[in-house]
């Protein structure tokens, strides 16, 4: 079964995440574990590793690290992605999320809806960038990419 069965966020930031960021993280992990599609392609003439997988996301030396293990915790892969392609979309996503959280407190539903539509658009762009960067390393569907992008944002800013 090619899916993620466990996810861990290796967060080494000395600053604890805000309540909103922690909530986003918990929801993304719950949704991701409920439904996801994650497969590793065949590489270097070897058959692809079979899931379910345990995934640890981390930032090390300025790179996004995917540490992938079997359900029995045997290492089946690790790859590193440059954070460069994510920087602007992560920054935009956090700015729009801040606006959204503030809007929910004081604006009418029509204005909240407009901000939420913009937030979803930026989130979709982040998922697209992630799918593109994962090409040849891991195969994910768009919903899995969206949830992983949320976790990357939390890791990046949390």
From Swiss-Prot:
It holds the Pfam family UPF0262. Belongs to the UPF0262 family. This is UPF0262 protein RSKD131_1985. The lineage of its organism: Bacteria, Pseudomonadati, Pseudomonadota, Alphaproteobacteria, Rhodobacterales.
């Amino acid at each position: 079964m090619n899916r993620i069965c466990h996810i861990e966020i290796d967060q080494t930031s000395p600053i604890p995440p805000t309540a909103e960021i922690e909530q986003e993280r918990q929801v993304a992990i719950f949704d991701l574990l409920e439904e996801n599609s994650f497969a590793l392609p065949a590489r270097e003439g070897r058959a692809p590793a079979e899931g379910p997988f345990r995934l640890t996301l981390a930032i090390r030396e300025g790179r996004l690290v995917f540490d992938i293990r079997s359900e029995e915790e045997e290492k089946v892969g690790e790859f590193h992605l440059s954070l460069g392609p994510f920087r602007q979309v992560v920054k935009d996503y956090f700015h729009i999320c801040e606006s959204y959280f503030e809007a929910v407190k004081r604006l009418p539903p029509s204005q909240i809806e407009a901000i939420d539509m913009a937030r979803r658009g930026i989130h979709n762009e982040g998922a697209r960038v992630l799918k593109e960067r994962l090409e040849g390393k891991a195969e994910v569907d768009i919903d899995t990419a969206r949830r992983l992008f949320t976790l990357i944002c939390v890791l990046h800013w949390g």
